[in-house]
Amino acid sequence: MRIKKLALIILTFSLSLPVLAENSTSIVDENRLLQADKETDNWLSFGRSYNNQNFSPLKQINTSTVKRLVPKWVFQTGEKGSFQTQPLVADGVMYATIPGNDVVALDAAKGTVLWRYKHKNRREKTKAGPANRGAALGYGKVFEATNDGRLIALDKNTGEIIWDKIIARPTDAELQGLSETQKKFLTENIDSLPAKMAPLIYKDLVVVGVTSAGYGLFYNIFEGITSEKVPPHDRFLGIRGYVAAFDVNTGKEVWRWYTTKSGAWEGKFSTTTPEGDKLPRDIPREKELATKLKDRWRIGGSSTWMTPSFDPKLGLIFLGTGNASPNDVSSARPGDNLYANSLVAIDAYTGETRWHYQQVPHDLWGYDVASNSVLFDLPDGDNVIPAIGIAGKTGWFYVHNRNTGELIYRSEPFVPQHNLFQAPTDKGIISFPGSWGGASWSPVSYNPKNGWVYIPGIHKPTRYRLQYGQFEGKEVPYILTEVAESEPNWGTLTAIDTRKQGQIQWQIKTEQPLIGGVLATGGNLVFMGEGNGMFAAFDSGNGKRLWEFNCGAGVNAPPISYKVGEQQFIAVAAGGNSYFKYPSGDSIIGFGLSSK
């Protein structure tokens, strides 16, 4: 089915005054969040439940009936821009964030507006665009982390603000040892620490992390961090990334875990990845610089892009971390740069590190661990391993024992790989996946019925070139990272069997890189959107495209499925992606089966 204009397919569209939906007063409490997998009609948290599997067991829409899938309603936000939200649904009400950090509550069966919170941005500039990846629901509140560095709790029935807290302000400990000039710089530039992820709620805590910490650039590798010199123009200092937990009732910070390890972020000066891939490092030079730059962890960057998964039995949350800062001048950050580019397990109640696995020590290429982590059980003979998997920008799916962090295996590569860990040169090298490739933030989906994981991939080659700049009379080398415009780029949707050491079961190629995420269902379907506006359903067993619909704008957000009454719905945001230059829009579309 292909329709160019959404106006032709709108069955219900409303900007009505607030009206309470049936059962809207039901509270999503701790027990419901713990048992979210059993609430098949709802989608209570990001990824649907704490395991982050992005799987719905609903099967009214299946391989036989999907050809009858049609739009049942369309809600247009009035705000165009990169639209990355994953809506939540509880008891017939949908909650969604939109670009610019407004939050809406909709009748999930009709798409009509129940209430809308209009966000007033406190900062005119941030280091990231207006996109937001979703809300969290619990204890009678809707929580949103914003692009102006705030965490907001709204009344779930009215959208009224309950509390509103700044989360991006540096602590006194972070500012310790800095000059007054640098303290002022960091404090006045907290707008460079927005938040994108949907918050995570458990017990009485709401957890969220900050982004853009790794955008800091080089300013002086020859002086200590206490230098009075502040980088000119846009040569921003990096800021120490973190994830933090807040009291759900007051917004008071309970603990904060930093993505850069204080005093020991140099690590072991690893010459290879953990799997043995050789890294281009001058260890003697790095060790020499490390003595001069021992406090560089204070501005070490490393963002947190996606909502952590949570294991209530182990009491651990799991998240991936971004690249260290400055990314373009590696000599300014000698050592492995712990815990950048890592999968990390954190005590959910104290914020203490349990284990970490650094995929790429001393990253030169922008290989953030940006995608969502997924929890699942991995058969091992007569036993079961509590496993965690995460797709990397390196192009592999990594599977670990989530209790110990031990790597069980990494999969077959789901995108092409070339010059993966090659050192940049004066002439320049072309590498892929590169900074834009592999698995970005887009959520993967895991089907617990067969153990297959479905990964949206990006093939977008990168050119890395050494450049030389003058700073304070010294010539400083830095890495210029560019899209390799002469190279073709595309996307891949890959099914990988986690029970067969990560073997690829099928793979399809798409015209454009895939950004947005996938949904697997009990109807043996996988749903995925594309930048060209197509929203499609595939047979989860063989990758055959069974259905598609042109949404009129890039579908670059993770879909969900839920049920209201006797009707199963598939819902997704269609608003495009400005970074990839996909067509913009402002719609959330709810699909269901037609009677014929």
PLM features: residue spans?
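Beta-propeller blade signature
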Residues: 154-159, 231-233, 239-252, 336-352, ...
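Blade/loop signatures of beta-propeller domains
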Residues: 23-71, 270, 274-283, 482-483, ...
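Extracytoplasmic beta-rich repeat domains
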Residues: 75-86, 116-136, 164-198, 213-215, ...
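Repeat-blade elements of multi-bladed beta-propeller folds
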Residues: 43-47, 82-102, 126-151, 187-220, ...
